[in-house]
């Protein structure tokens, strides 16, 4: 099947697979939100949160109008008016970022397949990688690609993977732990003299409105990032 400058097919799992762009063979491998994979062949491709691809998905700006291929072959028009956070880990490379997102209702979501091409005008700009429920009849559809100018993205080597932990109410975050605010400073000071040869770790703390990422040696915090949420969560993994 063809649309604009792409050729695509539907695989046995009912997902859309982009086969060619501008008559050049394409590779697009979609990852579950938070998924960790070990496959050295994937390292040769571009990576954006939720996807490994031979295609460079361009930078978009908030409020861009996009068109998404629906299951009946028509194009659904949506607006990038929200943001969300997604990540994956590929060969110990932690790829993460805030992504522009469109809001869809239940009826629209049922018309969309994972892998469906996303266009701005007639140009391919991304693919459908996930959905995130934010209300009874409201979902976020993230649009992955080069970082939107006002958002944050990044990647880092994580030798021991990424631990994901729900950020509990009335807690503050330092390193690998969350504690009440009146205890967190003392805990941080106690880590100053700990051994620098301790095990490295990366922890992602999340709540609906905010994401924290820490990189640590033992309980000593080396880096601490703050970003807006929500975290796109897979249906098959429970984050404690």
UniProtKB/Swiss-Prot annotation:
Listed EC numbers: 3.1.-.-
Site positions for Substrate binding: 93, 146, 226
Extent of the signal sequence: none
UniProt keywords, alphabetically: Hydrolase, Nuclease
Presence of keyword Hydrolase: yes
Catalytic residues, chain numbering: 46 (proton donor), 181 (shared with catalytic histidine of dimeric partner), 185 (proton acceptor)
Pfam families with a match to the protein in the record: Baculo_p26
Domain of life of the native organism: Viruses
Top-level EC class as recorded in UniProt: hydrolase
InterPro entries assigned: Poxin_vir (IPR006853)
GO molecular function: 2',3'-cyclic GMP-AMP binding; nuclease activity
Reactions this protein catalyses: 2',3'-cGAMP + H2O = Gp(2'-5')Ap(3') + H(+)
Function as written in the Swiss-Prot or TrEMBL entry: Nuclease that cleaves host 2',3'-cGAMP.
HAMAP family listed in its UniProt record: Poxins
Domain notes for this protein: The substrate binding site is formed by the N-terminus of a monomer and the C-terminus of the opposite monomer.
Record family assignment: Belongs to the poxin family.
Name of the protein in its database record: Poxin
Organism of origin: Autographa californica nuclear polyhedrosis virus
Name of the gene: P26
């Amino acid at each position: 099947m063809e649309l604009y400058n792409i050729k695509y097919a539907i695989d046995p799992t009912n997902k859309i697979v982009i086969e060619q762009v501008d008559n050049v063979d394409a590779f697009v491998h979609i990852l579950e939100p938070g998924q960790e994979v070990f496959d050295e062949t994937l390292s040769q491709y571009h990576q954006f949160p939720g996807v490994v691809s031979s295609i460079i998905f361009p930078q978009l700006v908030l409020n861009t109008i996009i068109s998404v291929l629906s299951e009946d072959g028509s194009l659904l028009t949506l607006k990038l008016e929200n943001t969300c956070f997604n990540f994956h880990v590929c060969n110990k490379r932690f790829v993460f970022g805030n992504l522009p997102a469109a809001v869809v209702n239940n009826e629209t979501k049922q018309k969309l397949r994972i892998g469906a091409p996303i266009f701005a005008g007639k140009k391919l700009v991304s693919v459908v990688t996930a959905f995130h429920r934010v209300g009874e009849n409201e979902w976020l559809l993230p649009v992955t690609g080069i970082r939107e100018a006002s958002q944050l993205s990044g990647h880092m080597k994580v030798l021991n993977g990424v631990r994901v932990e729900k950020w509990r109410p009335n807690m503050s975050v330092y390193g690998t732990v969350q504690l009440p605010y009146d205890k967190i400073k003392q805990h941080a000071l106690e880590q100053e003299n700990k051994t620098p040869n301790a095990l490295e770790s990366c922890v992602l703390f999340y709540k609906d409105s905010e994401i924290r990422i820490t990189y640590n040696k033992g309980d000593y915090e080396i880096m601490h990032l703050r970003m807006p949420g929500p975290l796109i969560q897979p249906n098959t993994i429970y984050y404690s």
